Curated annotation (Swiss-Prot):
Keyword Ribosomal protein among record annotations: no
Keyword Transcription regulation (UniProt): no
Compartments it resides in: Cytoplasm
Lineage: Bacteria, Pseudomonadati, Pseudomonadota, Gammaproteobacteria, Alteromonadales
Function as written in the Swiss-Prot or TrEMBL entry: ATPase subunit of a proteasome-like degradation complex; this subunit has chaperone activity. The binding of ATP and its subsequent hydrolysis by HslU are essential for unfolding of protein substrates subsequently hydrolyzed by HslV. HslU recognizes the N-terminal part of its protein substrates and unfolds these before they are guided to HslV for hydrolysis.
Protein name (database record): ATP-dependent protease ATPase subunit HslU
InterPro entries reported for this sequence: AAA+_ATPase (IPR003593), ATP-dep_Clp_protease_ClpX (IPR050052), ATPase_AAA_core (IPR003959), Clp_ATPase_C (IPR019489), HslU (IPR004491), P-loop_NTPase (IPR027417)
Organism in which the protein naturally occurs: Alteromonas mediterranea (strain DSM 17117 / CIP 110805 / LMG 28347 / Deep ecotype)
Amino acid sequence: MSEMTPREIVHELDRHIIGQQDAKRAVSIALRNRWRRMQLEPELRQEVTPKNILMIGPTGVGKTEIARRLAKLANAPFIKVEATKFTEVGYVGKEVETIIRDLADIAVKMTKENEMKKVKFRAEEAAEERILDVLLPPPEDAWGNKEDVEDRGTRQAFRKKLRQGDLDDKEIEIDVALPQVGVEIMAPPGMEEMTNQLQGMFQNLSGSQKKKKKLKIKEALKLLIEEEAARLVNQEDLKEKAIESVEQHGIVFVDEIDKICKREGNNSGDVSREGVQRDLLPLVEGSTVSTKHGMVKTDHILFIASGAFQMSKPSDLIPELQGRLPIRVELSALKVGDFKRILTEPNASLTQQYIALMKTEGVDIRFDDSGIQRIAEAAWQVNERTENIGARRLHTVLERLMEDISFDASEKSGESFVIDADYVNNHLETLVDNEDLSRFIL
């Protein structure tokens, strides 16, 4: 779980996302509150529920990007889902409870990786011993029994060579555990326990089979370390820790929530829209979901919802769900200045990406300040005249601008190009000024 302060979280988000300080502050406080809650006494901790967030703003202003970056910073089970992928219980499609099941799977994977890191040193030692046993097999007596004769000097010499990598390319034959045969059983929701028992039965029938494999020592060592680490990790403890991690630190980001609102003037009983909201409500309020790893309580899972709300308003959400999203954050539409900053300031900005890509062909690209200003203006103009798709318009404009250089780059190795205002005007002016063309091409 992340122990970063709100200021540190905002600073980290600033490296990738331009502007939108209100949204950054809201998610950073919510993330820090997860840590604060864990410092409380157990009795009080149970009473402190997360303050869920609703992010409102036009498309392409950074809502989804904030979620993506937050996932990396959270160091906790995190899942991003699209609200439009789900349908009401009883209809064909995914049910909202699969969100928690997928989150539990993510937590198990994260916990397994952490637990395997803890036993890595012991696993490495055990893997080394197995390889040394293959390289220096103990002598056998007349009856084929292995004699316990220790030659410490030779073993230590081989161990040293193994650790230095001198034996990496030598081929050996080892016994490797075969992956257990996974039998996928499609069962109705709520019958996960039965499914697990059947899967466990099939896995036990297949048993832990081994197969001889001829591998280079470097590859064999990697395989054996994983095998030994998996053997040292207690699977039951792992599941318990994973479920606790989901319940106490889990974060769910629900994108496109405005698409499941009941639109104004539409009085038809739209099943898939309002029904999904009603199914989502118990998860946000707090309920218990059955997963293949065990029962998961959702009382303390943080939910962050986002939507453009162009065809609907937040008030079109059902009242109970509105009440469960108390923190509202509005993200502002992007201006020319924002576009200019997006092109230059973030880590691995779009201009840096194009410079690096062309460098692989030996072509040197430089973006002049006047060129960047003109690209930003062109993107903003097209957004204003046609559909406003926010920062995503920059991808379209830049791809069109760089098309000629990208196509001829392999024949122009060693050449240099400066992208200034004149270059941008020559390549984009007719497209930007002609509304019909920009509608179809930009």
